[in-house]
Amino acid sequence: MHSLIKEYTDKIAGRKAYWIPLLFYTFGAYGFSMLNRTLGADDLGTPLYVNDTVWLQDLRWGAVLWKKLFSFGSFVPFLDKFLSICFLMLAGTAFSCLLYLLNGKRERVLLYTIASCSFLTFPIICEIWEFTCGGTLIVPGDFFCIFMILVWLLCRITASEASSNPQNAASGASSPARPQALSAGRRHPRQSSSAAILPQQAAVLLAAGVLMTPVISSAESIAPVYVTTVLIILFYRYCIQRTSPERKSAWFFEGVRFAIPLVTAFALRLIIAYSILAVLGLERKHTGATRIEWFGMNAEKFAALIKGMFINYGVASLINFPITVFVICAVLFALRCILLTIRRRSALPVFLGICIGLSLFLITLIQGSVMLYRTAITLMVFCAFVFYLFAETFYAWINAGIINRKTLPVLAGRCGLVFLLFITWRQAAHLHRFLALNNLRYDNETAVMQEICYTLSTDYDTSKPLIFVGNFSNGDAMYYSTHDSGKTRAGAMYRKIRHKIDGTPVWKSPLLVQSTVSSAIDFYHEEFDGRLMGEYIAYYGYDFNVPALSRDEHIPYNEEAAGLGMKPFNIADRGDYILICIGSLD
């Protein structure tokens, strides 16, 4: 593996044609976010998530480990985002290294530039990027670890192939290795017996499982990334490479061996997590969308699940750019699978293609709930792989045109590569837009909170409990920036289709993002029974008495504020406590 990384660095990653575009796209997408302070949901959650027991009770002890090792404090936005960008660039480079090993070490730098840049700019990551406590640092680091573990495993596979098939090893690195290592293919006469190599293989697979344990213990959305990437490896090795295995079942046995580290990691995760709960005397709890909903599933809920998934990951392509890119990639990938099936006279490309498609929504298959965009990070890997496949196709056109001395294929191939780079830039621009909007949301909320806190400190007795009621709004400008207006044909069509599917009123504007640009004020005074609202106010330099109240406990205070006719930003001294209306009471 060390020699592979050195070779890849010298021939690909160290070339200006690779790292200059990588830096250009990365800082175009994330530079503003890294260099500007933004406080949002979860950002002040370190005292609860890491120092307290929230993540431990949710079996996310790996996330605690990440924060303890790589972050320093409750809210260090520049450091967390800087490290996140570093991990994300390393993850993109590791993903390209994986492709470099898969394709027989082709030295076409632009292939890997497109794969890396399209991966790290896919805009769905904006849903978790600003969560500097729970997502920003952890997810990019997990991506990097998973890709490096798979590079290591694939290195062992190709090394095993080389030792078991000297003729194939002698043919040179330019020809793809035959996909029979760690599988049940027919052995070469010089190959050692399976009984002799099995202990070494088992040790490698178990070691990979141990390394992956803290990674999949960070968040539920990480394990599907491993599954999707493994299926991509199998698809490329057994459907794209021209050499075919000696046994049709070779792909299955290789897939089983890739599954062993994941199963090992899951088992170790549960053993360690429940051991921690037992030692600390804690109970298992769920935070966020982590519950298994299949147990209470009925026909009506199942229909709602199917409709929700179809709307979010199909119909939404009419208005939501990252979903548009995903749907186009999915359609083109499906056509590629069909063509490969016809050409190879085998159903394997279609079968593995379906498996890849299902793996993208593995969270829904496991939990029985509509997959939120913030957990749909498998789409980043899938779309980057499809971009890479078409970059390969365009290079094939260029080579064919040069060999046959025809200008049109060369021109078409080069235009195709430029188009992929352009779409990658559009992804970066879209990502930057919503991260910048989130910064504007922070500026607006900061102005509101500073004015409210100053008024309280000068005109009221702040030793009394402060009760915050209502739902904050960032105003019409922010609303129309994060919702589809319906004025375009695509927007109007989306609303009509959505209405026919689930009955949502046509006038209701759909969100373009689910997590980004969400109100920090609402989060801190509602979530975790308002236990973080005091921390939120202290962030602005004020130490007030803010009691922790559950949603149910807030209801009578909301009703009281409505009865008083309070408007947004009104303050009322009620004798024993002070009511602060921060938004709509509806």
Protein language model regions, located:
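Intrinsically disordered, polar/acidic, low-complexity terminal segments
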Residues: 2-57, 61, 67, 71-91, ...
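Membrane-lumen/periplasm interface segments of specific transmembrane helices
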Residues: 28-29, 33, 255-326, 363
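Membrane-interface micro-motifs in multi-pass membrane enzymes
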Residues: 56, 60, 109-157, 217-219, ...
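Hydrophobic, aromatic-rich transmembrane alpha-helices
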Residues: 93, 320-347
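Membrane-interface transmembrane helices that cradle and orient dolichyl/undecaprenyl
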Residues: 145-204, 239-245
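Signature aromatic-anchored transmembrane alpha helix within multi-pass, membrane-resident enzymes
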Residues: 187-188, 201-202, 395-429
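Membrane-interface alpha helices of multi-pass inner-membrane proteins
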Residues: 201-220, 231, 264
